[in-house]
């Protein structure tokens, strides 16, 4: 692979990673420990490897029409997660709120990586080199998720409980933006 072929993949990796960054800003406003931030970022990175890989494999056999379905599903997941964060912040006390672990972490990581599935579909049809592409997507998304989570964590310290509500609203807004791009 030449450098000229690698540049568009790097740009795509950052574009997909910005989704993870934006959503992680909101998630970072939840009460998270550094260990959880590390684990969340790694999980997002792994999903950004798995999802485009599946997309690339399927993209070699399926038409592009499924990209819209993946886009819609990712938006709905983000909106649902955002409402959950707002709900848990307003209606539950501090002890009952849960950090994104277990199934909620996988739902979160799936939601922010679903766009990479549709990109993988397109790249699979195009015939891009699979290993380089998925590793690049995973690494960049993991790095940007960590940055977003850490910035969100510091913003939460400044905003308190309202920061968590703002984080949930950011997720809902981002999901709505995916559904209805301006």
Swiss-Prot record:
Keyword Manganese included in the entry's annotation: yes
Single GO term (MF): manganese ion transmembrane transporter activity
GO terms under cellular component: plasma membrane
Residue ranges crossing the lipid bilayer per the database entry: 6-26, 37-57, 71-91, 101-121, 131-151, 162-182
Any GO BP annotation: manganese ion export across plasma membrane
Superkingdom to which the source organism belongs: Bacteria
Membrane topology: Multi-pass membrane protein
Compartment annotation: Cell membrane
Task performed by this protein: Probably functions as a manganese efflux pump.
Protein name in UniProt: Putative manganese efflux pump MntP
């Amino acid at each position: 692979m030449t450098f000229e072929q690698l540049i568009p993949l790097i740009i795509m990796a950052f574009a997909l990673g910005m989704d993870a960054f934006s959503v992680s800003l909101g998630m970072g406003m939840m009460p998270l420990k550094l260990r959880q931030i590390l684990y969340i970022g790694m999980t997002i990175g792994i999903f950004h490897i798995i999802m485009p890989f599946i997309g690339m494999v399927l993209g070699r056999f399926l038409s592009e029409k499924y990209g819209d379905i993946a886009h819609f599903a990712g938006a709905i997941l983000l909106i649902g997660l955002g409402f959950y964060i707002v709900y848990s912040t307003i209606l539950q006390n501090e002890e009952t709120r849960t950090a994104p672990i277990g199934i909620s972490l996988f739902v979160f990581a799936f939601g922010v990586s679903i766009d990479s599935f549709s990109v993988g579909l397109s790249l699979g049809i195009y015939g891009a080199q699979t290993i380089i592409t998925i590793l690049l997507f995973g690494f960049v998304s993991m790095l940007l998720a960590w940055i977003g989570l850490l910035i969100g964590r510091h913003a939460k310290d400044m905003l308190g409980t309202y920061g968590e509500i703002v984080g949930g609203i950011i997720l809902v807004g981002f999901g709505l933006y995916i559904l209805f791009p301006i």
